Amino acid sequence: VEDHCYYHGRVQNDAESTASISACNGLKGHFKLQGETYFIEPLKIPNSEAHAVYKYENIEKEDEAPKMCGVTQTNWESDEPIKKTLGLIVPPHGQKFEKKFIELIIVVDHSMVTKYNNDLTAVRTEIYERLNTVNEIYLPLNIHVALVGIVFWSNRDLINVTSSAADTLHSFGEWRGSDLLNQKRHDHAQLLTNVTLDGTTLGITFVFGMCKSDRSVELIRDYSNITFNMAYIMAHEMGHSLGMLHDTKSCTCGDKPCIMFSKESVPPPKEFSSCSYDQYNKYLLKYNPKCIVDPPLRKDIASPAVCGNGVWEEGEECDCGSPEDCENPCCDAATCKLKPGAECGNGECCDNCKIRKAGTECRPARDDCDVAEHCTGQSAECPRNEFQRNGQPCLNNSGYCYNGDCPIMLNQCIALFSPSATVAQDSCFQRNLQGSYYGHCRKEIGHYGKRFPCAAQDVKCGRLYCLDNSFKKNMRCKKDFSYSDENKGIVEPGTKCEDGKVCINRKCVDVNTAY
């Protein structure tokens, strides 16, 4: 695949227009002009540079069956932890968010490899084009999705991929937590399949799942040959991981329906609604997702560079965004090359176009489980964000570090219920010995799968029980449970369950041997 051939932009003299174009082998992509969506692609004529331009409405429909997202959660979790502890008001739609980066791995299952006749280059090219459009969609939220790897299950699937979207998603999440995270660091993983999911389901994910080891995953059915359609489904499911729910009638955007509408729309929407903006903002305030804060290292990005997207990628000397938006005195926005005399144009170790001295702190430690990083004096990039070792005591010995966080039951209760919530008394956790629908440690795959009780020593690694002291509640053994996501409300991996012990795979094990 050629470098520097993926672009975002707009049609000249139309500020409301948008465009997402690949120029790798002719022009291919889409643009929106005066409210209409158009496609452009090369005509398949030998020795010809002719292209076809046509409206979305002229595309032959692939089938008439209505298609839907598999996420069923309809309510945002209680706002109390946000309102009471932070005292913040949700900013208005259209606000400028702080830049976030999602490092994405896409897993291509065996059915997809077969669909493309084992042409892995064709699959890669299609993924690059979809991701180019996803990043165009997420520009207003100031989020960049960086592809850091593609995994092909060329010979066989490594999990059981079935038509049950929920079961496959859970299996994929468990595999990510136990296998994929150990192979390559990333923030979010997508499983791309050609298997028909529950009839009309196009995709499914865990709401609020971003950054969580077994929940920062999504499952996408490759239902359409139209790149735009598939990019929209990717953007929609990723929105759920970032705290967005399906839009209701009160949600507005420039051109309804909006991205988080629950059913497939024709043509697909490209704008997030006022509700999505508010929900994403609340998600950032409540969950403070650390994994999406830092930019990826250039060498980790697996997709071709996009000059003008504001992200410094391999093959670029710098990238300050589009020529219209660039305010960087070191960088030529049109070419993504440094201006004469400049040593650097991007990176935390670049100051006034010069590389900072070795030893200069470029990323301070955020908390007990983080460590500070320092410039090397050789590169404008700040070294990869590193954390304290797993098992390091944190929060005054209340917990142990796990993948850069300090998971403790108290904070999990507060996040689930209210700022006044605390951990329930030990007797509540004895309910996890029942192996019931609500109290268990493990279950078989499937909604009706058998539940297995916790062993006596593992009761604090199953369902989390809290004491909710908020107004008029005072519930002594309160739990959180979701029929669509039965892992919700389970004690998080790495949580301290006893002195010197942590929860790993729903078992309370010695912290010295857990990792």
UniProtKB/Swiss-Prot annotation:
PROSITE patterns, per the entry: ADAM_MEPRO, DISINTEGRIN_1, DISINTEGRIN_2, ZINC_PROTEASE
Native organism taxonomy: Eukaryota, Metazoa, Chordata, Craniata, Vertebrata
Name of protein: Zinc metalloproteinase-disintegrin-like EoMP06
Keyword Transferase listed: no
Domain Peptidase M12B: 100-296
Complexes and interactors: Monomer.
Motif position, D/ECD-tripeptide: 368-370
Glycosylation positions in this chain: N160, N194, N225
Originating organism: Echis ocellatus (Ocellated saw-scaled viper)
E.C. numbers: 3.4.24.-
InterPro entries reported in the protein's UniProt record: ADAM_Cys-rich, Disintegrin_CS, Disintegrin_dom, Disintegrin_dom_sf, MetalloPept_cat_dom_sf, Peptidase_M12B, Reprolysin_adamalysin
Propeptide positions: 1-94
Residue positions binding Zn(2+): H236, H240, H246
Family: Belongs to the venom metalloproteinase (M12B) family. P-III subfamily. P-IIIa sub-subfamily.
Cell compartments where the protein resides: Secreted
Cysteines engaged in disulfide bonds, as pairs: C211-C291, C251-C275, C253-C258, C307-C336, C318-C331, C320-C326, C330-C353, C344-C350, C349-C375, C362-C382, C369-C401, C394-C406, C413-C466, C428-C477, C441-C454, C461-C503, C497-C508
Cofactor (UniProt): Zn(2+)
